[in-house]
Amino acid sequence: MTRYLVRPGSRLAGRFPVPGDKSISHRAVILGALAEGVTEVEGLLEGADVLATIAAFRSMGVQMEGPDKGHLRIHGAGLQGLRAPVVPLDCGNSGTAMRLLAGVLAGQPFPSTLVGDASLQKRPMGRILNPLRAMGAEIAAQDGRAPLHIHGRPLHGIDYALPVASAQVKSAVLLAGLYADGQTCVTEPAPTRDHSERMLQGFGQPVERHGPRACLRGGGRLCGQALQVPGDISSAAFFLLGATIAPGSDLTLEGVGINPTRTGIIEILTRMGARIDLTALREVGGEPVADIRVRYAPLQGIAIPPRLVPLAIDEFPALFIAAACAKGQTVITGAEELRVKESDRIAVMAGGLRALGATVEERVDGAIISGSALLGGRVDSHGDHRIAMAFAMAALVAQGDMEILDCANVATSFPSFPALAQQAGLLLEVASA
């Protein structure tokens, strides 16, 4: 078992980029594989999740060179060029890979099976099964969970209203729509990341967007592109947290994607009193990008507006720590989606904070966190990469050393986290049990 041993009392400083965006990296691989011609990707995240997506398409006959230092060359097979895999496609720990691949595979003229690790096989897949089946897909899954046994069939377009805001479900339906007769539309109840819509248009697939509604027509074609993946704001979030809570910190993160559907972490921390400045604003690969400077600032507890929850859904482990370090109470509501992530993030974060001496009232859709001094001690991340990184940053202000258990899955999204954290000043040691 991989453990993090972290000593308190340091600060974060320096200037460096964070790795490529995981969500965009997945989509670059998928659309590059389905496009005609060559797609060149720079800045690709080489984490285990994205590597699982690459391996899946290689199993379906797509030729790729790399990845090597963030560069991947994809020789696209075209929308109709995938070949039947001879083995199950292993998505590892990646819900994004499984849900988006299900959308692609639903319309293929061959059977396929999607599997994952023990954590992924506990996550709900009914949310993609329902719309894909409504489009004509034949998918077998026990209790709405992986493994997914998909028998490709001709699909027809649907007009689908998402019951829960989910970019993964939206993307799965739109990808299936590429293979469907007629128009496929998705309406979301709250804004979610729009990387799929942006990238589909970049690859030549028209997407009509009207407020919460996105529509496309099947029967088109995608054309290979040259793509630059911006830095991942979800990875940057841990450094935004650390520099905000550790006195004397002054840190600049270069080339971070600031897509407005992903910047909830910045808005929430700013509402709490964080000193965050965006500089060198520019556009990279159709996505807004900036350098982010963050300095220490005392935080004040707030009631987080529910409308911001989908815009920061992956960053809540960091926000739980920020709340514990703030003066007063922070109230989180409308965040029940956190219970079906890589772990039950509400329960695991609440339990971890209590182990460090914090006062947390857990609720079905969130929590009330009272700011207090954090003790040292042992915290179990339950194999959740984002929880492991959040508690590593909490150690900056703990009153004693911290040991964080079960950290190996950090490699799924941020394999260079320990090295970058050490470079920035975190007194972190990686150990094996």
Curated annotation (Swiss-Prot):
Record-linked Pfam families? EPSP_synthase (PF00275)
What are the binding positions for phosphoenolpyruvate in this chain? 22, 95, 123, 168, 345, 386
Does Cytoplasm show up as a keyword for this record?
Answer: yes
UniProt subcellular location: Cytoplasm
The top EC class, named as a word, is transferase
From the UniProt record, give the pathway where this protein acts: Metabolic intermediate biosynthesis; chorismate biosynthesis; chorismate from D-erythrose 4-phosphate and phosphoenolpyruvate: step 6/7
Q: Give the catalysed reaction(s), semicolon-separated.
A: 3-phosphoshikimate + phosphoenolpyruvate = 5-O-(1-carboxyvinyl)-3-phosphoshikimate + phosphate
Q: Coiled-coil annotation: which residues?
A: none
Q: Which SUPFAM superfamilies match?
A: EPT/RTPC-like
List, in alphabetical order, the GO biological process terms annotated in this UniProt record: amino acid biosynthetic process; aromatic amino acid family biosynthetic process; chorismate biosynthetic process
Q: Does the keyword Protein transport apply?
A: no
Q: Where does 3-phosphoshikimate bind?
A: 22-23, 27, 166, 168, 314, 341
Could you tell me the superkingdom of the organism this chain comes from? Bacteria
Keyword annotations: Amino-acid biosynthesis, Aromatic amino acid biosynthesis, Cytoplasm, Transferase
Which EC number applies?
Answer: 2.5.1.19
Report the GO terms under cellular component.
Answer: cytoplasm
Q: Which GO terms describe its molecular function?
A: 3-phosphoshikimate 1-carboxyvinyltransferase activity
InterPro entries from the UniProt entry? Enolpyruvate_Tfrase_dom (IPR001986), Enolpyruvate_Tfrase_sf (IPR036968), EPSP_synthase (IPR006264), EPSP_synthase_CS (IPR023193), RNA3'P_cycl/enolpyr_Trfase_a/b (IPR013792)
Active site positions, chain numbering:
314
- Which Gene3D superfamilies does its entry note? Enolpyruvate transferase domain
Note the HAMAP family from the entry: EPSP_synth
Task of the protein? Catalyzes the transfer of the enolpyruvyl moiety of phosphoenolpyruvate (PEP) to the 5-hydroxyl of shikimate-3-phosphate (S3P) to produce enolpyruvyl shikimate-3-phosphate and inorganic phosphate.
Q: Which family is it part of?
A: Belongs to the EPSP synthase family.
Assembly and binders: Monomer.
Q: What is the name of this protein?
A: 3-phosphoshikimate 1-carboxyvinyltransferase
Q: Which organism is it from?
A: Acidithiobacillus ferrooxidans (strain ATCC 23270 / DSM 14882 / CIP 104768 / NCIMB 8455) (Ferrobacillus ferrooxidans (strain ATCC 23270))
Name the encoding gene, please.
aroA
